Amino acid sequence: MDFHRVTATADPLYAPAMALYRASFPSHEQRQTASQEAILSHPDYHFLVLTEQGAPVGPLLNWDTPHFRYIEHFAISPALRGRSFGSRALQAWADRADTPVILEIDPLTTDIAVRRNRFYERL
C-alpha cells in the first residue's frame, strides 16, 4: 500500500478518490467541492489517496501540523472493507510521524457513528 498526496484536481487520482469520498460520507459531513478544491494547496492539508498496486482504494484527508495530525475523512473501497485493510492503512499512516493523531466522530446517535467508533476502538 502506498500514499499519494494530491495537490491539484488535475491529478489522475483525485476524481476516483472524490467519488469514493462522496459515496462514503453523508452530504452534511462533506466539504463542498469548491472548498475542497481550494484547500488542496494548503501546506498543512494532506489529501492522500491510498493505492494498492497503483489502483486507488481510498482517501485519507487530514491536517498535518508540527504538533498533531487530525483526520477529517477516511474511507476504504467497499470491496476491501472488513478485511483489515483500513486498520493496516491507518496504522501505516500513523507510523509515518511521531505527532499525536486526533480522530473525530459524530455523537453515537446513528448507526454509522457507532460503526466508526467501533472501528477506531479496534485500532
Task: Specify the residue positions occupied by each region the protein language model found.
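Short amphipathic alpha-helix that is part of the acyltransferase structural core
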Residues: M1-S35
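Active-site rim helix/loop that mediates acceptor-substrate recognition in acyltransferases
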Residues: R22-P56
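Conserved beta-strand in the GNAT
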Residues: V49, G54-D64, F68-A75
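Short strand-loop junctions, especially beta-strand C-caps/beta-turns
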Residues: F74, A79, E104-L108
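Conserved acetyl-CoA-binding loop-helix of GNAT-fold acetyltransferases
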Residues: I76, G82-D95
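Conserved GNAT acetyl-CoA-binding A-motif
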Residues: R96-D111
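Conserved active-site alpha-helix within GNAT-family acetyltransferase domains
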Residues: P107-L123
